[in-house]
Amino acid sequence: MDSINKCESHTPMMQQYLRLKSEHPEVFLFYRMGDFYELFYDDAKRASRLLDISLTQRGQSAGTPIPMAGVPYHVIDNYLAKLVQLGESAAICEQVGDPSTSKGPVERKVVRIVTPGTISDEALLQEKQDNLLAAVWQDKQGLGYATLDISSGRFRAMEPKDLEALKTELQRTHPSELLYPETFELIDLIESRQGLRRRPLWEFELETARQQLNLQFGTQDLTGFGVEQAHLALRAAGCLLQYVKDTQRTSLPHIRELILQHEEDNVTIDAASRRNLELTENLSGGTENTLASILDCTVTSMGSRMLKRWLHMPITDMSTLHHRQEAIRVLQHVASDLKPLLRKVGDLERILARLALRTARPRDLARMRLAFEQLPEIHDVLNTCKSQHLKKLLSEIGQFDALLDLLRRAIVDVPPVLIRDGGVIATGYNEELDKWRALSDGAHDYLNELEIRERHELKLDTLKVGFNAIHGYYIQVSRAQSHLIPAHYARRQTLKNVERYIIPELKEYEDKVLTSKGKALSIEKDLYEEIFDLLLPHIASLQTSSTALAELDVLSNLAERADTLNYVCPVLTEKSVIEITGGRHPVVEQVSKQPFIANPISLSPERRMLIITGPNMGGKSTYMRQTALIVLLAHIGSFVPADKAIIGSVDRIFTRIGAADDLASGRSTFMVEMTETANILHNATEKSLVLMDEIGRGTSTYDGLSLAWACAENLSIHIKSMTLFATHYFELTSLPEKINGIVNVHLQALEQGDEIAFMHSVHEGAASKSYGLAVAALAGVPKKVIDRARQRLEELEFTLEENGHTKPSLPASKPVFEKESTDHPVIRKLKTLKPDTMTPYDALQWIYYLQKMF
């Protein structure tokens, strides 16, 4: 590496490369050389491995072979996509000087830096998924977190109240790139993420952040955005903006505001609950059989992204929810007319971001034109609708007749992919361009006339006029007739059977045509930039329009889904109540081959907790999840899968359902479950919906039962949350007798011989048995094992009954974990004994039995 750093020992070109590389040491440097982007030294070695491209050498520099790898310029996006997916970044270095006037290496400079969180190119983005850049700040005062979607301009900040809240936000936003300060102490929280960027402390300075943000928004202070006093959030937001400016190296007019998020505005769903509910990602990491897979039939990518944001951030504002419900109800009558129009609108949101960054391609402008053409018809469809919310959306959508006229006049119907290909600007838009094009386009007629004239004058029937990319224009004659050509014909190329010539007249025309093509392309590029200048003053209203169009797509999609899937409009209330008649699981009912059994649920202050019993595979988890999903759907304004629903306002949705070992963190299944349970007990309120499934499994019977009992007590007596508590501890079914507000329900099953039929229907009261052996048989456990288990079960039950011993029962009035409790299990056992009737052998057996309890 020492020889690399001694630039004077290298060739001028390598000196230029090394100087540029020293300015960007942590990213790949793609160095433009002709038709290739080249990488050298360590960049070449790593790129060869990551991108599966050939590693070669480019001679020697300072006596050392130079490792080199390269990719053709026209497929650079494909390789950049691979890199950003791996969390890598790349600096793109272009030739900006004129080779004909350059002394030494052509001038080059880095024109942009492509990072996972700052990409806007269509080829690099997932079309139906937000791509976020995030920054996190931590100090003694607390935490700050900010996100920016550069492909839309959406800029958000918040101040998580604790570590768990930050963890929830990281899981919800899932940033592609995360910036953190040198002093950040919570490395364990982020170290497993890709795209981590350690940034200098000064980028998070509060005053620097204020200056950056005010400069971006053209304001004197940030009071109007409501973030002036949010110091922790501002630090994170300031670092984000600085980083984006450094990487994009252009103005960012589409980033127009910073919105401060408040926890109370949304229904909080922690990381574990979000995973368990499978909103947009299933437990295997895929997208199949998720809520989004059923609900998302949007026709624009920006609508799909907005719907997913709604699912991950349900809201609590009743006014907004009622407006959405009203709009959906109206759109049920016109959704079929709207969808074809919205489909042609396309991804206007991201097109506008590329316009703002001045990276929009010709086809982006053509798609923008197509979107504008749909707006009058969208207005026609919705003008008669009485929904106030739809009227508001229509006013925000607007119409852009002047811009539509500009794009119709300026851009050809089907433009090429890139402006450098030429042929983008329509004929008639610019007189000078048309003049130069006419000269170039007239070449065909001129060459035909020249060929006819020369063939006639020279009487050479094999004479032809043509063009070659290397040698230019030529007059071709067969070798057999070549002796007949006149003296002013100058030989240009000799082939096997023909000779090619040039004459002064053709050479003069060639120079004129080639000049005209270059001139026409130069004018086109200038006109293309002028079109940007004409469009950009409207970027604010265009962004408002695209956001409204995306919401219209979401609402019309929810209207169609409500019709197709037989959803009903829930009644929303501020009370702590959930009353659902004929509730269904939105995903299971669509993917199951069996008819789905709908079930009711009733939760209220007088009926706070349901103790749910029944067999495994009986439907307990489905019943619990469907309740949470129905409540979630109601809090995005959607209709819900039920016959009737009254949904009260909730502040949080917690689920403790299923778990697996966290091997990376060294945590057992039981530890994972207890961690999730602790989070619920610390953060749930009486306005929370809590789903608890099989608390206490994974440890001894008494430990597990004690934990389950204490959790149920705490949730019902102290927290008073609306709780669904599924369990196999039948002792818990006695809780309704001890605590008001707890009710038993069970999932019904029918057993006949060795077979069991799950009815999947919910009934009041506790289950009579667990059906564990029947479920084991259904799972394929060998019959001889089942028979032995049944025999052993009968023996155990007989032994307990014979000795007057029943299953343990825990009273609600005593703290379960009190060390000096007189109700210790051993004491309870001893109290059941009758020493006067026991033989010495019986007494010895009891001692052994008591030993096994420990």
From Swiss-Prot:
Give the Pfam families listed for this entry: MutS_I, MutS_II, MutS_III, MutS_IV, MutS_V
What's in the keyword line of the UniProt record?
A: ATP-binding, DNA damage, DNA repair, DNA-binding, Nucleotide-binding
Q: One MF term from GO for this chain?
A: mismatched DNA binding
Top-level taxon in the UniProt lineage: Bacteria
Single GO biological process annotation from the record: mismatch repair
Name the SMART domains for this protein.
MUTSac (SM00534), MUTSd (SM00533)
| Coiled-coil stretches | none
A GO CC term?
cytosol
Q: Which residues bind ATP?
A: G614, P615, N616, M617, G618, G619, K620, S621
Similarity-based family: Belongs to the DNA mismatch repair MutS family.
What is the purpose of this protein? Answer: This protein is involved in the repair of mismatches in DNA. It is possible that it carries out the mismatch recognition step. This protein has a weak ATPase activity.
What is the name of this protein? DNA mismatch repair protein MutS
Q: What is the lineage of its organism?
A: Bacteria, Pseudomonadati, Pseudomonadota, Gammaproteobacteria, Enterobacterales
